[in-house]
């Protein structure tokens, strides 16, 4: 990546909104981005998890049984799966999902980009320090 591109994609740019701890929305480019390394995860009109590396974890590994008994609080892999989503460039863990086996990856964040852009243009919202603020 060229220095100019990296500067343009810096997390300090005024068009970036922090959505979660590790996920940003570049509103002008309509792209999901890792806020640790600025890697583009994909179109903000789609599920950001499509651009992530996914790791299926054994729930017994994540939550080992504390009591050696037939019935304990360790999750049963026939009832739950744990899926971790990572940035493919810097390996930052962006999200973790607990899902029933066979359930598709959830599309948990869907932003009305057109309406958001309209409200930014009208001055109803501003972006300050990567935070979206309503203007009174």
Which role fits each region the language model picked out?
Residues 31-44, 48, 82-85, 94:
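Short, structured motif recognition centered on aromatic/hydrophobic residues
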Residues 27-30, 80-83, 109:
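Short metal-coordination and nucleic-acid-contact micro-motifs, chiefly zinc-binding Cys/His arrays
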Residues 88-93, 100:
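Internal, hydrophobic beta-strand segments that form the core of beta-sheet-rich folds
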Residues 1-26, 50-72, 76, 98-136:
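Intrinsic disorder/low-complexity detector
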Residues 76, 80-88:
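Short beta-strand-alpha-helix junction that forms the catalytic/metal-binding core
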